[in-house]
C-alpha cells in the first residue's frame, strides 16, 4: 500500500474512531486531497474533527470543501422533500434507496458525498409516479450512447432517470444486479413487502421514508456487490461500514441477516468487507460474526477498492480499461456483441449509414486493438494486464460476486435471465 493510501485510511480512522493518526513528514497533501476526492470520502474527513497534525492550509481548504458539500447536501435534501410531498399528496408512498438512506448512519449525514435521489415505488404505482413527475416539471434524461440505449431497452426501464432544477432522480421499478431469477424474486418480494412496513427516520430535520433495517442493509450490500465488477471505492465501503456499526449486531446477524445474505449469495462478501473494515478502517470489533473471514481476501479487497476509486474513477486511463476488459469472462457471442456496440457507439459513419451497421464490430475490433497495441511495450503489457485481469476475476469469484454471462431483468411482467452483453 502506498503512503497516500495509508494517509487516507489513517485520516478516516482518526475522524471516525478518534485513533491517533500517523503521517509521513513528506506527505503530499495535494495527492491526499485528490485521492479523497476520487474515493468520494473527502466530506467524511473534512466534516469531522481534523487531527492537529494536518497542515493549517490543508485544513482551511478541506473545511471550505466540506462547506460546499454541506450546501449541496441540503439542496438535495430539499429537492427530495419536495418530491416526496408531491408523491404523497397523490397517494404514492415510496422509500428512499441508498443516498440519504445510507447517510443516516454517518455521525453527520452531510459528511456523505451525494449523487442522485434514488427511490423505489410499489410496482403498480411506478407508471403513475412517472406520469405525475413529468406533469410537474421533472424531465427524463436522455441516454446518449448506443451501449446505454440498448441496455435501457433490454432491462425494460429498471429505473427512470429524471432531472429537475439541476438535481437527478431515479425512480426504480426494482432494485438489484443479480444473476439468478430466484435470487431476484426473493429480494424483490422482500423490498415490496418492506415498503408496506416503511420506517420514518429523521434526517437533518426531514422525515425520511426507509425500508426496514434488514431490507435496507441488503440494498447497501447488494449495491456494493453489483458495482464491484465496474469498480467500487471507499464510499461504498463506508456506507456498509456505518450500517454495520449502527445496526448489524451479532444477534441481528444470527437471527435474520446471515440467512438473507446467504440467499443472495452475499454472505462471504458481507463477512470479508466487514472484517476488512475492522482490520484497516478502524471499525470496532464488537461484531464477531465476521471473525472467520479470510484475512488474505480482506487485504486483496482493500487493494482492489483503493485501486478502483469511486465507481471505477481511477480506471479512466487506457491501461486500467484494458485490465477491466480482460478481467470479465466473455463467450465468443459476448465479445462480438461488445465489439458491435463499441463500433456503433464510436463509428459516426455507421450511425449515419444503415448499410455499414453490420460491420460495426470490425470497427470496434480495430478500436480496441489500437487502444491495446498503440502503447510502448504493448505485448508485454497486454500479458501483464491479462494476468491482473485474471487476479481480479478470481478475487470477485472468491468473494461470491463475480457475475456470469447472465443477468436478471424485468421483462413484461416478470423477471427473466438474459445475457448481460
Regions of interest found by a model, annotated:
Residues 1-115, 121-421:
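Conserved NTP-donor binding/palm subdomain of two-metal-ion nucleotidyltransferases/polymerases, i.e.
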Amino acid at each position: 500500500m502506498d503512503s497516500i493510501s495509508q494517509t487516507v485510511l489513517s485520516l478516516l480512522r482518526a475522524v471516525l474512531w478518534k485513533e491517533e493518526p500517523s503521517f509521513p513528514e513528506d506527505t503530499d497533501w495535494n495527492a491526499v486531497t485528490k485521492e479523497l476526492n476520487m474515493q468520494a470520502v473527502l466530506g467524511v474527513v473534512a466534516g469531522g474533527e481534523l487531527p492537529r497534525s494536518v497542515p493549517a492550509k490543508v485544513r482551511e481548504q478541506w473545511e471550505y470543501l466540506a462547506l460546499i458539500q454541506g450546501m449541496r447536501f441540503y439542496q438535495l435534501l430539499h429537492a427530495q422533500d419536495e418530491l416526496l410531498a408531491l408523491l404523497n399528496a397523490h397517494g404514492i408512498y415510496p422509500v428512499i434507496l441508498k443516498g440519504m438512506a445510507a447517510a443516516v448512519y454517518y455521525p453527520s449525514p452531510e459528511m456523505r458525498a451525494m449523487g442522485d435521489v434514488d427511490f423505489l415505488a410499489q410496482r403498480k404505482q411506478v407508471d403513475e409516479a412517472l406520469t405525475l413527475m413529468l406533469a410537474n416539471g421533472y424531465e427524463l434524461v436522455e441516454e446518449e450512447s448506443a451501449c446505454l440505449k440498448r441496455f435501457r431497452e433490454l432491462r425494460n426501464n429498471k429505473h427512470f432517470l429524471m432531472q429537475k432544477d439541476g438535481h437527478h432522480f431515479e425512480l426504480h421499478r426494482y432494485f438489484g444486479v443479480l444473476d439468478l431469477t430466484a435470487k431476484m424474486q426473493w429480494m424483490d418480494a422482500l423490498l415490496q413487502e418492506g415498503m408496506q412496513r416503511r420506517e420514518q427516520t429523521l434526517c437533518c430535520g426531514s422525515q425520511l421514508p426507509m425500508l426496514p433495517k434488514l431490507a435496507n442493509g441488503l440494498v447497501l450490500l447488494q449495491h456494493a456487490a453489483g458495482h464491484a465488477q465496474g469498480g467500487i471505492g471507499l464510499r461504498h465501503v463506508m456506507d456498509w461500514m456505518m450500517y454495520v456499526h449502527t445496526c448489524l449486531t451479532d444477534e441481528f446477524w444470527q437471527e435474520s441477516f446471515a440467512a438473507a445474505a446467504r440467499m443472495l449469495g452475499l454472505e462471504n462478501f458481507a463477512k470479508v468487507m466487514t472484517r476488512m473494515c475492522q482490520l484497516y478502517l478502524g471499525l470496532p470489533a464488537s461484531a464477531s460474526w465476521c471473525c472467520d473471514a479470510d484475512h488474505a481476501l480482506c487485504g486483496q479487497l482493500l487493494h482492489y477498492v483503493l485501486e478502483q476509486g469511486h465507481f471505477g474513477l481511477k480506471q479512466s486511463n487506457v491501461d486500467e480499461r484494458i485490465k477491466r476488459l480482460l478481467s470479465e469472462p466473455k463467450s465468443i457471442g459476448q465479445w462480438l456483441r461488445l465489439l458491435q456496440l463499441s463500433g456503433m457507439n464510436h463509428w459516426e459513419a455507421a450511425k449515419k449509414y444503415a448499410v455499414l451497421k453490420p460491420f460495426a464490430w470490425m470497427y470496434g475490433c480495430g478500436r480496441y486493438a489500437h487502444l491495446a497495441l498503440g502503447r510502448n511495450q504493448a505485448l508485454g503489457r497486454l500479458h501483464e494486464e491479462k494476468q491482473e485481469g485474471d487476479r481480479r476475476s478470481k478475487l470477485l469469484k472468491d468473494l461470491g460476486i463475480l457475475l456470469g454471462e447472465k443477468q436478471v431483468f424485468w421483462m413484461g411482467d416478470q423477471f427473466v435471465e438474459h445475457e448481460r452483453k
